[in-house]
Amino acid sequence: MRLFLSLLVVVLSMVLKGPTPAQGVPDVSNPFDVLEEFGKTLEDNVGEFINLITQSELPAKTRDWFSETFRKVKEKLRINS
């Protein structure tokens, strides 16, 4: 599910970004060159997206919230037992 959402975000960003002037007129001399260029662009965009996620505070906050909630549940179960 996460991979699907990540790919969806990358594809949407590429679509919304639109073609740059150098990409305005595609050269169709070799379809594999176009595919290779798309792969490199996709790799760069996914790399940027992963860096954005890893530098975000959201994963740390989520991990802290789960740890705190789990600790509270353990304490309640320990008190009731």
Swiss-Prot record:
Family (UniProt): Belongs to the apolipoprotein C1 family.
Gene3D superfamilies tied to this protein: Apolipoprotein C-I
Organism field: Macaca mulatta (Rhesus macaque)
GO BP term, example: negative regulation of cholesterol transport
MF terms (GO), sorted A to Z: fatty acid binding; phospholipase inhibitor activity
Lineage, opening ranks: Eukaryota, Metazoa, Chordata, Craniata, Vertebrata
PANTHER family: APOLIPOPROTEIN C-I, APOLIPOPROTEIN C-I, ACIDIC FORM
Span of the signal peptide: 1-24
Gene: APOC1A
Keywords assigned: Lipid transport, Secreted, Signal, Transport
Broad class of the protein's primary localization: secreted
Subcellular compartments: Secreted
Protein name (database record): Apolipoprotein C-I, acidic form
Miscellaneous field: Apolipoprotein C-I is present in acidic (APOC1A) and basic (APOC1B) forms in P.paniscus, P.abelii and P.troglodytes and perhaps also in baboons and macaques. The two genes for ApoC-I arose through a duplication process that occurred after the divergence of New World monkeys from the human lineage. In human, the acidic form has become a pseudogene sometime between the divergence of bonobos and chimpanzees from the human lineage and the appearance of the Denisovans. Pseudogenization resulted when the codon for the penultimate amino acid in the signal sequence was changed to a stop codon.
Entry's Gene Ontology cellular component terms: high-density lipoprotein particle; very-low-density lipoprotein particle
